[in-house]
Amino acid sequence: QIFDIYQQILVNMRLMYQKCRLVHADLSEYNLIMYKDGEIYIIDVSQSVEPNHPMALDFLRMDIKNINDYFQKKKKIDVFLEKEIFKFVIEDFDVLVKDFGDSEGPKEVEKDNFSDYKKENQYNAEGLMKLVGNLKLKLDEEDEKQDEIFRNLHLMRDLNSLEEQDFKRFREGKIDVFKTMVVDHRANKQEIA
């Protein structure tokens, strides 16, 4: 049951981001309430920021870390990789189905029926629970290192966020493609150049 609660919180984070267009920015076990029906509610959202806030992606990473730390250290369960959770929260539904769907579920939806499937499931907690369950678990020291690397990455929304040193590294041939440095995120539905 603890693992289900953990997954439900991740689904709520996605719904908050995708539907409400908010990042909590201070999410931890102290901002969660479990109602008697077993439903989890996220509270204390007054400091939440919109996805286009300059620090929104960093806040989201910290929210993910806080939730993972709580469930891993206090509740002693295996948790998902932080980068996988991040992707689960911010990606378009189509990408989620492609990356996290399984052969028995969403991946097998025919192209003709996908728009109907998307309408029914992109904000449906039950459907999202099936997808979140397919994220990769953090099981060893290598996974822990990957989380540490992800936490320390400088995330950028667009090319305007690049610093002069990044352009210098590009000219010197130390960076092949700028797009790999930019979070593939379309909060305003703008394509990344």
What label would you give each PLM region?
Residues 1-23, 35-36, 41, 50-94:
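ATP-dependent phospho-/nucleotidyl transfer catalytic cores
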Residues 69-193:
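Regulatory N- and C-terminal appendages and interdomain linkers associated
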Residues 27-34:
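Hydrophobic residue at the +6 position relative to the catalytic HRD Asp in the kinase catalytic loop
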